[in-house]
Amino acid sequence: MRPTGRSAQQVRPLTFTRHYTKHAEGSVLVEFGDTKVLCNATVEEGVPRFLKGQGQGWVTAEYGMLPRATHSRNAREAAKGKQGGRTLEIQRLIARSLRAAIDLKVLGEYTITLDCDVLQADGGTRTASITGACVALADALNQMVANGKLKKNPMKGMVAAVSVGIVKGEALCDLEYVEDSAAETDMNVVMTEDGRMVEVQGTAEGEPFSHEELLTLLALARGGIDTIVQAQKAALAD
């Protein structure tokens, strides 16, 4: 029995609160159970130096956790004077994932930054960030079309992510913290809405996992992501 009584295939209760803050071009509070992440999209004219003159845009991301997002307080990275390796890895993952959702040539010379701030962490913060940021990105792009900044929407489709893992020998979808901390195998999967893989991050914490277990976990992730994409689209249709 899982802590919240879910089935092995079931994702946590999922909500998207759009237009959560008023200044950002896209702003979404995403909640996967007790994990809550604020995702804001900012649109700016211009692109990084390495893209100037190429007629395409850029999507980047920043990620951070509030000091009391977890059980005990973690000092702000700004107070330490540098970002940690985990933070850098996660924000690069978020950016890579979101770039898979849009046609950068159609975007033109604009940069969109997704700021993902974890308000409360209970497992799956990076996958929640990707999932919520994609909705914020969609809102920002829709606004750019409505304002006449873009003639065509560069969004190719939704991108979503979920964690899967093996806990006490059982393959589970969308791990919460107590499951994640006890997992023998832990994997984060990012997919497009049509089931193509953007990124797969998998680690055996204990015993190595088999090829068959890998396929089981990927199938579990696909099912979870299908559910998540439906929720993304329903939120955007409101």
UniProtKB/Swiss-Prot annotation:
Coiled coil: none annotated. This is Ribonuclease PH. The keyword ATP-binding does not apply. It comes from the Bacteria. Homohexameric ring arranged as a trimer of dimers. InterPro entries: ExoRNase_PH_dom1, ExoRNase_PH_dom2, ExoRNase_PH_dom2_sf, PNPase/RNase_PH_dom_sf, Ribosomal_Su5_D2-typ_SF, RNase_PH, RNase_PH_bac-type, RNase_PH_CS. GO terms for molecular function: 3'-5'-RNA exonuclease activity; tRNA binding; tRNA nucleotidyltransferase activity.
